């Protein structure tokens, strides 16, 4: 694989995020730490332009509003027209009719480079579960076959996170086991990961490999952060520090990836 992290730091890809209030600051700081240049906006009046000029677009359904839903569709369609990869984080899909309708509209209208979600949300998209309760997955075991079903259904890469992370394009599948349970004890850790995928798909043409690289790098940063942190309060700044100090050599040294 290309030296993705070195290329991110060199190119400083512009990542347009339509995300939620809870995650916005944390995600922006994480993107800056890896070497990307983030924009965090959710007004429909800017969405088309940002979708055209970004190096990747991240659509996060966290604190959803009518305006945000409109902005996501505009940004996603503009990105598609300009060859810009789009990542979707369908938080709490199935939780409400409004949320599910917006997610369905995006899935029908926008060609996605990747879907990043927890195992419960992926199960909803696969039709295996009626609803997901949100960022905290109600499915503990991450089943590769469910992720593969969604990847094939939407012709995209699926990054399904859980105790073991699954990355698949429907044909190739990898199990990624880097990470730390402390990520479950801070808010917006999954949202940051979704944004984190953006720089990688902007510099790696094979989105499946980009997904593996992103989730593995993030997991390694979490592991190294917990060597210095004593709890969630000290973990957050330590995680940002370790993201900042990530290198391709460090990822190669610590990666735990098993391709099926």
Curated annotation (Swiss-Prot):
GO molecular function, a single term: magnesium ion binding
Amino acids binding substrate: 40, 188
CDD domains for this protein: THZ_kinase (cd01170)
Residues the record lists as binding ATP: 116, 161
Catalyses which reaction(s): 5-(2-hydroxyethyl)-4-methylthiazole + ATP = 4-methyl-5-(2-phosphooxyethyl)-thiazole + ADP + H(+)
Keywords associated with the record: ATP-binding, Kinase, Magnesium, Metal-binding, Nucleotide-binding, Thiamine biosynthesis, Transferase
Pathway membership: Cofactor biosynthesis; thiamine diphosphate biosynthesis; 4-methyl-5-(2-phosphoethyl)-thiazole from 5-(2-hydroxyethyl)-4-methylthiazole: step 1/1
GO biological process: thiamine biosynthetic process; thiamine diphosphate biosynthetic process
Gene3D superfamilies: 3.40.1190.20
Assigned EC number: 2.7.1.50
Cofactor requirements of the protein: Mg(2+)
Function field: Catalyzes the phosphorylation of the hydroxyl group of 4-methyl-5-beta-hydroxyethylthiazole (THZ).
HAMAP family according to UniProt: Thz_kinase
Family statement drawn from the similarity comment of this UniProt entry: Belongs to the Thz kinase family.
NCBIfam families: PRK09355.1, thiM
Designated name of the protein: Hydroxyethylthiazole kinase 2
Organism of origin: Oceanobacillus iheyensis (strain DSM 14371 / CIP 107618 / JCM 11309 / KCTC 3954 / HTE831)
């Amino acid at each position: 694989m290309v030296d993705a992290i070195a290329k991110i730091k060199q190119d400083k890809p512009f990542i347009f995020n339509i995300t939620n209030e809870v995650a916005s600051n944390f995600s922006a700081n994480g993107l800056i730490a890896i070497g990307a240049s983030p924009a965090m906006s959710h007004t429909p009046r800017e969405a088309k332009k940002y979708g055209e000029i970004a190096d990747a677009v991240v659509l996060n359904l966290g604190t959803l509003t009518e305006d945000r839903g409109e902005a996501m569709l505009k940004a996603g369609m503009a990105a598609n027209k300009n060859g810009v990869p789009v990542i979707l984080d369908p938080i709490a899909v199935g939780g409400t009719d409004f949320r599910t309708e917006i997610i369905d509209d995006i899935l029908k209208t926008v060609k996605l480079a990747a879907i990043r979600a927890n195992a419960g949300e992926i199960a909803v998209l696969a039709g295996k579960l009626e609803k997901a309760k949100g960022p905290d997955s109600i499915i503990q075991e991450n089943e590769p076959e469910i992720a593969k079903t969604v990847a094939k259904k939407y012709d995209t890469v699926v990054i399904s996170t859980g105790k073991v992370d699954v990355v698949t394009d429907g044909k190739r599948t990898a199990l990624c086991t880097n990470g730390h349970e402390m990520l479950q004890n801070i808010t917006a850790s999954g949202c940051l990961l979704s944004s984190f995928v953006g720089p990688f798909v902007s510099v790696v043409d094979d989105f499946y490999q980009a997904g593996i690289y992103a989730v593995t790098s993030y997991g390694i940063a979490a592991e190294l952060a917990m060597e210095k942190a004593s709890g969630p309060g000290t973990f957050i700044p330590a995680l940002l520090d370790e993201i900042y100090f990530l290198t391709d050599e460090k990822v190669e040294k610590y990666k735990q990836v098993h391709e099926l």
